[in-house]
UniProtKB/Swiss-Prot annotation:
Keywords: Ribonucleoprotein, Ribosomal protein, RNA-binding, rRNA-binding. With S4 and S12 plays an important role in translational accuracy. Located at the back of the 30S subunit body where it stabilizes the conformation of the head with respect to the body. Part of the 30S ribosomal subunit. Contacts proteins S4 and S8. Residues 12-75 form the S5 DRBM domain. It comes from Pseudomonas savastanoi pv. phaseolicola (strain 1448A / Race 6) (Pseudomonas syringae pv. phaseolicola (strain 1448A / Race 6)). InterPro entries: Ribosomal_Su5_D2-typ_SF, Ribosomal_uS5, Ribosomal_uS5_bac-type, Ribosomal_uS5_C, Ribosomal_uS5_N, Ribosomal_uS5_N_CS, Ribsml_uS5_D2-typ_fold_subgr. It comes from the Bacteria. This is Small ribosomal subunit protein uS5. NCBIfam families: rpsE_bact. GO terms for cellular component: small ribosomal subunit. One of its GO terms (biological process) is translation. The keyword Nuclease does not apply. The lineage of its organism: Bacteria, Pseudomonadati, Pseudomonadota, Gammaproteobacteria, Pseudomonadales. GO terms for molecular function: rRNA binding; structural constituent of ribosome.
Length: 166
């Protein structure tokens, strides 16, 4: 697992989560291709992930970064943490995330940590169950973050005040 991060001109934080080598066997030998999984975020609630494939690692990473910028979502954060505890799953990967008090930090493993860091979450407790395949863990984390709503948006949908729903 690689954890490469850098800042770009647009103000996005980019993290390389995984590079995988795949070999296709043909008559003349093996053909190697590389798959890259990246996450991109602005540190203020916008986050995206992407996958790229190429015969060379830098090209695969570049394709993944472009895909991640096209696939961005907005996450409603509660200051530096999540709104509420949540569970999410993708394939055999299951993730659990819960808000944490100030000063806790990001207590999460591998691929989940990368997503939460670039999203701007600074205090969270998270656990991954089942498969720890980085692709499925990132998908499951995104499903959870995408479904999270602020109390203000829930109240607006119901036509009530925030105090009435809390």
């Amino acid at each position: 697992m690689s954890n490469h991060d850098q800042k770009r001109d647009e103000g996005y934080i980019e993290k390389l989560v995984q590079v995988n080598r795949v070999a296709k066997t043909v008559k003349g030998g093996r053909i190697f291709t590389f798959t890259a999984l990246t996450v991109v975020g602005d540190g203020k609630g916008r986050v995206g992930f992407g996958r790229g494939k190429s015969r060379e690692v830098p090209a695969a990473i570049q394709k993944a970064m472009e895909a991640a910028r096209r696939n961005m979502i907005q996450v409603d954060l509660n200051c530096t943490t999540l709104q509420y505890a949540m569970k999410s799953a993708h394939g055999a990967s299951k993730v659990y995330m819960q808000p944490a008090s100030e000063g806790t930090g990001i207590i999460a493993g591998g691929a989940m940590r990368a997503v939460l860091e670039v999203a701007g979450v600074q205090n969270v407790l998270a656990k991954c169950y089942g498969s720890t395949n980085p692709v499925n863990v990132v998908h499951a984390t995104f499903k959870g973050l995408k479904g999270m709503q602020s109390p203000e948006s829930i109240a607006a949908k119901r036509g009530k005040r925030v105090e009435e729903i809390i």
